[in-house]
């Protein structure tokens, strides 16, 4: 039985893969997830063994440099002594600057280090840690920014999909009577989405029978509920939830940001989507994620800056009038994911580490 630490933190995009890896490995190994305060918000502590290791946020302000160095050193020492005390043999990092202190401590202790890159462009933290790792797990052979001399470390795996989503896929759901649209702002919510679509949604509701499911930030719930109520649009408004897949299954069409976990879950559940990447994502990784899957004809992609009034109305009107457009996307996704198998994926990953 190996002792494994999975290092993660920050947003759901880093934490969700960590949870999947935990579920793959915990039955035959002793596994712990190390995360920062933000990451703990996405983890059910009754299901996962966790260790909090807070890491200072990188700041461009020169006045923050000395506090950053002190806090970073404390994070490193915390990681080092925890790894040593628990006799950890394998470290898996799911990316982000939060994992750097733990990875450096693991390097000094000469542990096996495995990196995971969920995006189609290599993140800066993973790029920095490449020299120290045994392998880096990705979803593609063609990862942007992966140095040629490091390509031998790239090991392509199937997307890390949560077990509850595997189970949910086979369950039947009651079909909505109206054309159902889900708007996903991501684990952090997308305030821009709350305002970007309003005029078009009002117009759609007056011309077609539609139902809206809208995931937003908890701060904007009240305001958004008021908007839908005042415009007589049938809707369900909610903040971040671990059961989003249950809502996805009910819907005909998804409008979403394009974090790796979200896009992969939509593809697995065979739900056509319109991706609107977060324009300020690091290295524009959301655009590259969306572009990769749109090139496989699973959905559509539009830049937020090019999103004009009346675009969404015309786009969804076309989908409602011509169901074949959605059916073709669903067929393409079905052919892509039909060989996904939870037990097989788990067994394969066990053998890799």
Q: Can you name each region flagged by the protein language model?
A:
Residues 6-19, 191:
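A short, glycine/small-residue-rich beta-strand->loop->alpha-helix junction that serves as a flexible
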Residues 339-353:
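C-terminal alpha-helical cap of glycosyltransferases
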């Amino acid at each position: 039985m190996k002792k494994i630490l999975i290092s993660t933190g920050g947003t759901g995009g880093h934490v969700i893969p960590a949870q999947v890896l935990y579920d793959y490995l915990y039955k035959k190994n002793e596994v712990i997830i190390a995360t920062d305060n933000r990451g703990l918000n996405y983890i059910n502590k009754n299901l996962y063994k966790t260790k909090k290791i807070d890491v200072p946020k990188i700041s461009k302000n020169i006045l923050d440099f000395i506090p950053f160095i002190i806090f970073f050193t404390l994070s490193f020492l915390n990681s080092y002594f925890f790894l040593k005390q628990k006799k950890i043999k394998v470290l898996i990092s799911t990316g982000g600057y939060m994992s750097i202190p733990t990875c450096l401590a693991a390097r000094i202790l000469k542990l096996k280090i495995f990196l995971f890159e969920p995006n189609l462009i290599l993140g800066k933290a993973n790029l920095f840690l490449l020299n120290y790792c045994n392998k880096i797990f990705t979803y593609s052979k063609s990862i942007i920014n992966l140095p040629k001399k490091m390509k031998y470390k790239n090991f392509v795996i199937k997307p890390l999909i949560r077990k509850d989503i595997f189970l949910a896929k086979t369950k039947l759901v009651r079909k909505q009577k109206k054309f159902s649209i889900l708007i996903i702002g991501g684990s952090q919510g997308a305030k821009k989405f709350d305002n970007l679509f309003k005029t078009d949604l009002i117009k759609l509701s007056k011309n077609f029978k539609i139902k809206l499911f809208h995931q937003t930030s908890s701060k904007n719930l009240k305001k958004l509920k008021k908007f839908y109520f005042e415009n007589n649009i049938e809707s369900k408004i909610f903040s971040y939830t671990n059961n989003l897949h249950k809502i996805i299954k009910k819907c005909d069409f998804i409008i979403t940001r394009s974090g790796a976990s979200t896009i992969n879950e939509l593809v697995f559940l065979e739900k056509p989507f319109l991706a609107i990447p977060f324009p300020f994502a690091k290295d524009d990784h959301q655009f590259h994620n969306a572009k990769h899957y749109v090139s496989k004809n699973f959905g559509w992609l539009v830049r937020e800056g090019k999103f004009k009034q009346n675009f969404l109305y015309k786009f969804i009107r076309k989908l409602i009038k011509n169901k074949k457009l959605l059916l073709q996307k669903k067929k393409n996704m079905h052919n892509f994911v039909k060989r996904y198998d939870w037990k097989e994926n788990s067994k394969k990953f066990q053998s890799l580490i």
